[in-house]
Design a protein with these regions (language model features):
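Terminal alpha-helical segments
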Residues: 1-132
Length: 132
């Protein structure tokens, strides 16, 4: 049986893999809707991985930002501005997920670049504090 810490580390490694392979690949191929979805996955898995390492259960929903700010923000050394930014990123990517998945909106290069930058920010902030 795996521990919460091991489960969390696995989620963080998966987030890193998706970032390096899928998200970067979608950007290179100019598949902007896929880039939005992969950025959302990176953020969701990063936040949930960190929560899991801390032994915090999370709901099985795509938006984890508010719980992360509330719980992990207390236990880890994040400044308020960083937490606010993580919550904003998590919210907008969770909201963009369905339209990008079902083709309800054609996301642009600028949207995808923003998503990429935001996912990179979140994964770097989590990585700096989780020591996986």
């Amino acid at each position: 049986m795996t521990t919460s810490k091991e489960q969390g580390e696995k989620l963080l490694k998966e987030a890193q893999w998706i970032f390096e392979k899928d998200l970067k690949g979608a950007m290179e191929e100019e598949n902007y809707n896929l880039a939005i979805r992969r950025a959302q996955e990176v953020v969701e898995l990063s936040l949930k991985g960190c929560l899991r390492i801390l032994g915090i259960d999370y709901p099985k929903v795509h938006y984890a930002g508010l719980l992360f700010v509330k719980e992990a923000g207390k236990k880890l050394n994040f400044n308020k501005n960083t937490l606010t930014e993580i919550e904003r990123i998590s919210r907008w990517l969770a909201e963009a997920r369905a339209p990008s998945f079902y083709g309800e909106r054609d996301f642009t290069s600028e949207d995808a670049k923003k998503a990429f930058k935001d996912a990179a920010f979140v994964i770097a902030e989590i990585k700096a504090r989780s020591r996986y």
